[in-house]
A protein has these predicted regions:
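PLP-dependent aminotransferase class I/II
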Residues: 1-135
Length: 135
């Protein structure tokens, strides 16, 4: 459908921008993204999650804040349950779930919706690249 084709194009723009960024980063600080397509699979491109390898939650929050200052709303998906108020009230402690925290600590989700133009996607990835290079 037209919507899925548009999402494919948007993801391709993001991937190209991040691949270019990674060429300038050391191996420890590579930005990882979910491979949405392969010979045996193709996702709906519902979310565009990236992992800022080797970065702390504070550094990721800095990126999120800088993106917001430029009018770009990012998000953090899949916050670990032990970090949510209801679970804390039952005594869950994120320190007991280091793998969950590790997956959360350097993740950010870039905007990906069909109301965006290709120019919007370019704006997002250009700013993301600039901000991450500044870390």
């Amino acid at each position: 459908s037209g919507m899925l084709e548009k999402r494919h194009k948007m993801v391709a723009i993001y991937n190209a921008g991040i691949d270019s960024l990674n060429a300038d980063l050391d191996a420890y600080h590579q930005v990882k993204y979910l491979n949405h397509m392969g010979p045996d699979h193709c996702s709906s491109h519902h979310l565009y999650l990236v992992r800022l390898s080797g970065r702390s939650r504070e550094e990721v929050n800095h990126v999120i804040g800088q993106m917001a200052e430029r009018g770009i709303a990012t998000n953090v998906h899949y916050k670990p349950l032990p970090m949510m108020t209801a679970y804390k009230a039952y005594g869950f402690d994120i320190a007991d779930f280091p793998n969950a925290y590790h997956l959360f600590e350097n993740e950010v989700t870039l905007p990906l919706n069909t109301k965006m133009s290709m120019e919007d996607v370019e704006y997002v990835v250009e700013n993301f690249v600039e901000i991450v290079k500044g870390l």
